[in-house]
Amino acid sequence: MALPLPPGLTQNEVAFLAEMEMVTVVPRQRLDSIDLLGGKTPQLRPPHRAQLPLWLALLLKKQRRANIVPPAWMHPASLAEIIHRETKEDPEAFSPPPPPPSRALYSQPGTARRLNPSYLDDFTQTQQDSQQDPNSILSPPFLPSNVAESPAGYLPYHWLEVAEALLTHAGDDMPAPAGEVRSLLRDLVEVRAAKMRSSTSALEGFGDAYLTLRGVGAMELAENRAFLAGLVDGVRKIGASAEATRREEEEEARRGGDYGGDGDEDSDEDMGL
């Protein structure tokens, strides 16, 4: 009998989904458009850059038909800036995700706005028909993101998976020696892992304690899902036990009050004291 699968995505599944992220390539030879499930790919015409899914870019790189342009956030200066921010400027929180992308609406060409649910609905229906809150601002993974367009100083949702894939299969395309980039990524992973473990201390308070995961990547969530789920479940059980004990003590105190003072006075009167 097969064992039940754990809830959530596994690390291999997260890495597979990350291969759908877009990256920038510089083609070495001409290639016509390819029909994919997500639409047609752009025609490749050297030396013009184009954006392709990561899996296709890695395939062309393996065939020596294109070079991959590393995203801006993978530059050593950007990684060093993120590490400094997470260790010196704000050691308690994770670095914020990239700002929501801007896109012009079909109904208002020439104007670019930050994407939110109302603007997303405008691509398929009029903005007046949208039932979403126009003031709500979402971020990846709840908005379409693009690793290739993520600015320096911010980590996209699939930053760890994309970085590992590019360093493994396109290390010669890195803006610096692959060893330097890998060392910075290792330091960043260790800093964020330690921060993830230490941030769980906020759950020790049973009141309004909460754990914020803003800025945490997909692979980090997959790696720590079992730990966090077990921790939350343990805190919930401890809190339920403490609440049950408190209610029992209150019930005993109330019963003691009912049988206490008035009963003693009545017994004294009966004895003529």
Curated annotation (Swiss-Prot):
Residues 261-273 have a biased composition (Acidic residues). It comes from the Eukaryota. Residues 244-257 have a biased composition (Basic and acidic residues). One of its GO terms (cellular component) is GINS complex. GO terms for biological process: chromosome segregation; DNA replication; double-strand break repair via break-induced replication. Keywords: Chromosome partition, DNA replication, Nucleus. It is found in: Nucleus. Residues 88-110, 240-273 are annotated as: Disordered. PANTHER family: DNA REPLICATION COMPLEX GINS PROTEIN PSF2. Component of the GINS complex which is a heterotetramer of div-26/sld5, drc-1/psf1, drc-2/psf2 and drc-3/psf3. Belongs to the GINS2/PSF2 family. This is DNA replication complex GINS protein psf2. It comes from Neurospora crassa (strain ATCC 24698 / 74-OR23-1A / CBS 708.71 / DSM 1257 / FGSC 987).
